C-alpha cells in the first residue's frame, strides 16, 4: 500500500487507459472490484482520471488488494513496473547480445523466405522477388485537413519519418511490398535514413496474436533464450527510437488479439519506438487521430509498371505485352494499380500471345485462374453443387451491386456452399473476434466483375426463368444518371463477357433513353457538349442542365460498352439504335483508342450522331510527339512542327463516311503553319454541315482566309477576340453558303472593303451576332445597308457597340421598314436613340414574328419617354413575344401602367427586363397587383435592377412574387439599400419556395452574415 501511495503520481501519469482497463478486468475477476466499481472505470474516457479512480478504490480495500493490483500491473505494463520498483533489466542485454539479435533479423530479411513472395496470394503459385520487382512508388504527404501537400519518395519519407507514420492506400497499391522493401534496405545497410535503427521488426497484423513478444516469436524468428519477455520489453524501453516496427495491414488487424500492438500504435508516446503502419483508406479513420505523419500511396507510374513487367517476364513477352499496353489507353490506366500489373503479367505467363485488351479480360483471366488453381481443393461434392455455388456467388455479387453492399453476413449465403467459395478464393471469410463471420470479395472491382459475369450468363441462358431474372436486373436501371454513375462498371463487365449479353444491354439502354428518366424527368434533347455559363442558362431549369450533362455521359458509356464488348460490327444495328440522334464531344488532345474502332466498325453509328464537337487547343510540340507515335497510318520523321494533332487527322480523314454536323473549335492557338491548315481541311471534309469556332487565336490574323478556303460545307462561323486582316474579312463575306455568323470583341479599325462593307453578300445568312466591335457612325450606315440584303435572317444581335453616333437610326430603319421573318432582335448597349425606338415602334407591324425583343442597357435621352410609350403601345402586334427587355430614360417609371396593360395580352412571357426604371413603392405595388390578376406562369427571368423600392414595398410584392414558380433568375439590385428584418425573413421564405432558381442578384442590398445565412440556398447568390 505504501508503494502505491508513494508512486501514485507516476502511476496516474503512466498507466494509460488500455492498461487501466486490463487491470480492472483482473481485479473484477478476483472479486477485488464489484460490478458497479468496474463500470465506473470502464465508462471513464480520460486515462488519468480512470487511473486515479482505480488506485483510490484499490487502496481503500487494503494491502491484499494492493498486492493484486501490482501483480496485474507487472503483467500488463512491465516497463512501468520495472521503472517504479527499480528492477530495470536492460543491463542484462549486452551490446553483443543486441548485435546477435540484429544480425538474425538481417539474415531473415536477406533470405529467400522473406524476399520471395506470392503477389496473388499463396494459393496461386506465382512468385515475385522483392529485390528484382520492387518499383519506386509515388507517395503524397497529407496535412491535417487530409489534403495532399507534398510528393514523397521512399527516401524522403524515411528522412522525414515521424512516429506513428501512417501509410494509406487502396487494395493493390503495393503497401505491403513497401514495408518489406524498408526491412530489406535496413538489412542491406545501404540506406542512410535507416542506419540509426538498431532493430527493425516487420509484422503482418492479420496474424498477430497474444503479446508483442509472442507475435515476433511466431512471425519472424526464434528470439535467443537469453532474451526473456521482460528483458525484451526492457530492451525496447531502453532503445526507444532506435527500434522501428513495420506493421502491415491495420485494416486486417483485430486489436483484441494483441492489445500491446494496438497500444504501440495509439499510445506511441509511452513506448517511444518508431512505428510505420499501413492500412486501407477505409480503415484509416481508426488511427488517423494518432498519426504524426500520414502518406498516401498514389498511382504507379508508367515507367515503374514497365520496370515491373521487365522484371518478371522474359524479353519477348515484355515486348509484346508493352506494345499492347501502349496501344490501349484503357490498359495504361489500369497499369496505375500494381495489382493489375501483376494480373496482366500473370495472364501473359504461359501464353504465346497477349490477349488482354479489356478490363473484363483481366478479371476473367484472374477469375478462371482462381477456379483452375483451387478447384482441386474442393472435395466431397457433386459437380452440380460446385456450379450452383459459383452461380450463387454471382447472384450475391449482383445483389450487392444493386444494394451498394460489399460486406455480407452468413444469412446472405444460406443456400450456397461457403466452403467451395472460400476454398477457391472467390470470397474471403473474416471470423476473428466476430460473433458472426463476414464475407467479402477481395476487391470491389472484382465483385463488380463477378456480378457482370453472372448477369451476362443470365441474359444468355437457355432457361426462360434465368433470362427473365436477368431482364429484371436490367429493368432496375431506369435512370440515366444511375446507369452512368452506379452501374457503369457492372454493364462494362456484362458486355465484356458476352456478345449476346451486349445485345440485350444495348436494347435496354436505347429504351431507357426513349422512355427512361433522370430524377423523374424525360430526357432532354439539348446539345450534349454545351457547357454554358449560368447567364446563358436562364431560359432553362437546373434539371435541364443536369440532364444534358448526364446524357452526354450516357453516350460515352455506350462507346465504352462497345469497346469492352469487342463485338466489332456484329451488333451494328443495336448500337445504331442507341446512338441515333445523340451528340459526341471529342478533345483533340485526348482521343481514346476506342474511337478509332468505333469509327471503323460502326460507321453507321457515327453517321447516326446528330452532332460531333471537336476542340483544339494551343499545345507545345515537345508534348505531342509521344502521343503521335502510335497514330494509325501516320508516319513522321523527326520532331513534329504542327499544332493540329495528326491523331485527330487520322481519326477524321481516314473515316469513309460523313458526319451530319461537325463543330470544330480552335482555342488559344498562337501559331498555325501551312501543314496545320492542310490538316484542318482534311478534318473539315468529314462533315456535311461544318461549324467553325475561333476563340482567342492570334494565329488567325492573315490566315483565316486560307483556313476558310478548306471549308466546303461551312454553315456556321464564330470568331471571338481574334485579330483579322482585311483579306480575312473579305473572304468571310465570300462564303455565300454561310448561315450563321458571330463576331465578338473585334477591336481593329474597320477598313474599306472589310466585313461591314460586304456583309450584304451573305444572302443565306439566318443568324448574325456582332458583339463589342469597333465601329463609327459611317460603319453603322454601311452595316444598315448590308442588312437590307439579308432577307433570310431570323436572329440579329448587335451588342456593346459604342461611338456610332446616330448610326442605330439607320440600322433600325433597314431592319424594320419592310416585312421580314426576324424572330429574335437584341440591340443591347448599342447607342440606341429615342428616334431609333420611334422608328422601331412605327414599323413594328413588319416584325410580327418577333418572339425576343431585347433593347436593354440603352439610355434614351431627348424624347425618350415619348418614344418608349409609343413602342409599348404597339407591342400588341407581337403575338409570339416571350422576351421583352426595355431601355430606360428620365421618368421612365411613368410608363409602367401602360406597359402592364399591354402585358395582359402576353401570358406566355418568359423574360421581362425593366432595368434602371427606378421603380418606387407605388410602381412595385402596381406590378404586384398585375401579377396577382394576370399571373405570368411561364416567367423565368425578371430584371428590376436600379429600383427605389422600400422594405414595405418589397414586403407587399413578395406575397405575389412567390407564385412565380418557373423563375430561374431575378435581379433586384440597387444602391445602398438596407432591408429590414421582416423583409429578410419574408425573402428567405419566398426563395425556399422558388425551387428552380439558379441565380439571384441583390447587389447593393446591405446584408449581414445572419441575413446571408437565412436567404442562401442551392442557387447562386450575388450581393456584391
Swiss-Prot record:
Binding site for ATP: 135, 172-177, 443
Pfam families given in the database record: CARD, NACHT, Nlrc4-like_WHD, NLRC4_HD
Post-translational modification: Phosphorylated at Ser-533 following infection of macrophages with S.typhimurium (Salmonella). Phosphorylation is essential for NLRC4 inflammasome function to promote caspase-1 activation and pyroptosis. PRKCD phosphorylates Ser-533 in vitro.
Cited SUPFAM superfamilies: DEATH domain, P-loop containing nucleoside triphosphate hydrolases, RNI-like
Phenotypic consequence of residue 533 to D: Mimics phosphorylation; causes rapid macrophage pyroptosis without infection
Localization (cell): Cytoplasm, Cytosol; Inflammasome
Residue ranges of domain CARD in the record: 1-88
Free-text function comment from the UniProt entry: Key component of inflammasomes that indirectly senses specific proteins from pathogenic bacteria and fungi and responds by assembling an inflammasome complex that promotes caspase-1 activation, cytokine production and macrophage pyroptosis. The NLRC4 inflammasome is activated as part of the innate immune response to a range of intracellular bacteria.
Protein name, entry field: NLR family CARD domain-containing protein 4
The species this protein was found in: Mus musculus
Organism phylogeny: Eukaryota, Metazoa, Chordata, Craniata, Vertebrata
